[in-house]
């Protein structure tokens, strides 16, 4: 059980969100104009349905709120806003936060410890984030705190807790589980060889299936070039689940860039 020291400031609704400025981040640059329009429509609904709550003196403005909403809606661009029905609030700290964590061990003893967290996603509760890591999520780097926590929420739709297997057809579960565990083992092998700091995929992905799904969801949207060629079978499963192919967006964007350079000569 985690105790939260809430001192909150809620963002007020704004009918004039700065969408053009909000879209101007590397994470979203490869979306087509049609995809951007649909993402904005989802983000507007997100801001109508969810409360963004600033904690510990952090101040939200329209641009910050719009960018947060756009990133929340990127994973469900083709799934629909109803896939985010499992929570009503997004709590935002200014930086990674300390919480009091209590747990009971196998013999019934209760332990307490202060833990530093970047974010949290609860089955029947809010998503908790921090602004420093949200800012780092704007880049196309493989790290994205918002997508990580959204992936946990999507994962939880398949049961009482995150398992690494989202809500997919039953016939696909065994194959998904096989490919996910194969990826975890591959990532762990790389960690054993070069160490956590030098691994090309965040070592957190090797800790358990739920974290592997969440971490690889970050790479799926923000660094597909690191995910797709390394785990092609699992990549295809992610494409089928999210109904998106970010690597295709990347190729199209690169081709358009090459064409533009040729046209200038």
Swiss-Prot record:
Keywords: Aminopeptidase, Cytoplasm, Hydrolase, Metal-binding, Metalloprotease, Protease, Zinc. It comes from the Bacteria. It holds the Pfam family Peptidase_M90. Its cofactor is Zn(2+). Its EC number is 3.4.11.-. Zn(2+) binds at residues 111, 148, 152, 211. CDD domains: Peptidase_M90_mtfA (cd20169). One of its GO terms (cellular component) is cytosol. InterPro entries: MetalloPept_cat_dom_sf (IPR024079), MtfA_enterob (IPR057256), MtfA_fam (IPR010384), MtfA_N (IPR042252). GO terms for biological process: proteolysis. It is found in: Cytoplasm. Binds 1 zinc ion per subunit. The keyword Cytoplasm applies. One of its GO terms (molecular function) is metallopeptidase activity. Interacts with Mlc. Belongs to the MtfA family. Involved in the modulation of the activity of the glucose-phosphotransferase system (glucose-PTS). Interacts with the transcriptional repressor Mlc, preventing its interaction with DNA and leading to the modulation of expression of genes regulated by Mlc, including ptsG, which encodes the PTS system glucose-specific EIICB component. Shows zinc-dependent metallopeptidase activity. This is Mlc titration factor A.
């Amino acid at each position: 059980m985690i105790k939260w020291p809430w001192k909150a400031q809620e963002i007020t609704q704004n009918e004039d969100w700065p969408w053009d400025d909000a879209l101007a981040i590397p994470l979203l640059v490869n979306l087509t104009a049609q995809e951007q329009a649909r993402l904005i429509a989802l983000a507007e609904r997100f801001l109508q349905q969810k409360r963004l709550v600033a904690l510990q003196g952090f101040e939200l403005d329209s641009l910050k709120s719009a960018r947060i909403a756009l990133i929340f809606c990127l994973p469900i661009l083709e799934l629909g806003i109803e896939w985010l029905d499992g929570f009503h609030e997004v709590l935002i700290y200014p930086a990674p936060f300390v919480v009091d964590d209590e747990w009971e061990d196998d013999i019934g003893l209760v332990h307490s410890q202060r833990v530093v967290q970047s974010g949290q996603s609860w089955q029947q509760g809010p998503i908790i984030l921090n602004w420093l890591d949200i800012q780092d999520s704007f880049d196309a780097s493989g790290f994205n705190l918002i997508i990580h926590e959204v992936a946990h929420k999507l994962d939880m739709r398949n049961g009482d807790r995150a398992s690494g297997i989202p809500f997919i057809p039953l016939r696909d579960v065994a194959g998904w589980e096989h490919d996910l565990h194969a990826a975890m083992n591959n990532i762990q092998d790389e960690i054993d060889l070069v160490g956590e700091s030098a691994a090309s995929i965040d070592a957190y992905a090797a800790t358990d299936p739920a974290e592997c799904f969440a971490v690889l969801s970050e790479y799926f949207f923000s660094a597909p070039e690191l995910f797709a060629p390394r785990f092609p079978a699992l990549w295809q499963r992610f494409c089928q689940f999210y109904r998106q192919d970010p690597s295709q967006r990347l190729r199209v964007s690169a081709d358009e860039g090459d064409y533009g350079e040729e046209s200038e000569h």
